[in-house]
Amino acid sequence: MPRVLIGPYLLRNQPGRFRQILTDAGFELIDPVGDFSLTSSQIRPHLPDIDAMLAGGERMTRDLFAIAPRLRAIARTGVGYDLIDVAAASAHKVAVTITPGTNQDSVAEQTMALLFALARRIVSNDRVIHSGGWERALVAPIRGKTLGLIGMGRIGRAVALRALAFRMRVVAFDTYIHAEFDERHGIERLPLDELLVTSDVVSLHLPLTDATRGMVNREFLAKMRPGSYLVNTSRGGLIVETDLRDALVSGHLTAAGLDVLCHEPPEPGNPLLGLPNVVLSPHIAGTDTQSMRDMAELAATTIVELHQNRWPADCVVNSELRNDWRW
């Protein structure tokens, strides 16, 4: 009987249709005991005996693939796969899949929630009242302000639609053009530097790659409009956190809303902890009850399809394996 390891904390030992999808296909499910994100030492004992992994925030490095001779598929819940050494996966003939189209609405809602938390001072007002105060300061409106989206994939476009509903002007930067969407919704494409100067709010919607790692650095932040806001619901590694701290402490940026950090959970010395103008959430943007269910079911389905030697082309990251991959 093939065995699949269940990685995400929110799915381990939890009911769900994804379990039925896998058990109906003849899989035995393994639910490890471990931290919110399983560590390498918690995954390692299971690797020699599993055929697939339904993954969340677990890191899969080259040395782990080397001790997983039966492993044929890693099905990632979500669309980011920067924690998986895809080159090593390909070298060991392990298909890596993602779940496109399952969580963009959840991420977009969290993006807007962070934007409003910053602009309307929701968190700081809450803290003041709970500590016995009652301060009523004016805030700037969102309507009429310019939102700059860096990245216009499914998530960026979902954010754009919500911002437009609040009568914001939306500008965007991406190397991929969705001309029909842009024209239909009045979205203007700008060069990156112009977007930074123009936008009242900059929101990041990019994968973490060698090209994007640390792109939000001192120079990037200096180009942003004075008094603007930064929102990040993609990957913490996009931002140089010490540089962001400096921009926030100096007042060049008014505030930042972050669902992601470079190290999660944050280490005690994280430079952003304790800043009154930073609103944080624990990397939950993509995981509401609906999106978690959809991601789990699609991930389970891709494992089953691969086991049956069907190729879920829209979900496989390392498509170069297709011609000679076998379960």
Which positions does each model-derived feature cover?
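Glycine-rich, N-terminal phosphate-binding loop of Rossmann-like dinucleotide-binding domains
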Residues: 8, 55-57, 78, 204-206, ...
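Short, Asp-centered acidic motifs that coordinate Mg2+ and/or phosphate
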Residues: 51-52, 73, 201, 229, ...
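An N-terminal-biased, well-structured beta-alpha scaffold segment characteristic
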Residues: 1-97, 217
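Rossmann-like dinucleotide-binding domain for NAD(H)/NADP(H)
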Residues: 96, 218, 227-327
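Glycine-rich Rossmann-fold phosphate-binding loop(s) that bind the pyrophosphate
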Residues: 152-153
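Phosphate-binding beta-alpha-beta segment of Rossmann-like dinucleotide-binding domains, i.e.
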Residues: 92-94, 100-146, 158-161, 310-317
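Short beta->alpha connector loops at strand-helix junctions that form conserved
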Residues: 33, 77-78, 94-105, 174, ...
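Rossmann-like adenosine-cofactor binding region
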Residues: 62-65, 175-271
